[in-house]
Amino acid sequence: MNXQQIDMLVKQLN
């Protein structure tokens, strides 16, 4: 996972 993927997941979870 890269930073962009993590950022997208965090946005979906919040």
Curated annotation (Swiss-Prot):
Induction: By phenol. Pathway: Aromatic compound metabolism; beta-ketoadipate pathway; 5-oxo-4,5-dihydro-2-furylacetate from catechol: step 1/3. Keywords: Aromatic hydrocarbons catabolism, Dioxygenase, Iron, Oxidoreductase. It is an enzyme of class 1 (oxidoreductase). It catalyses: catechol + O2 = cis,cis-muconate + 2 H(+). It comes from the Bacteria. Binds 1 Fe(3+) ion per subunit. Its EC number is 1.13.11.1. One of its GO terms (biological process) is beta-ketoadipate pathway. Its cofactor is Fe(3+). GO terms for molecular function: catechol 1,2-dioxygenase activity. The keyword Iron applies. Belongs to the intradiol ring-cleavage dioxygenase family. This is Catechol 1,2-dioxygenase. It comes from Acinetobacter calcoaceticus.
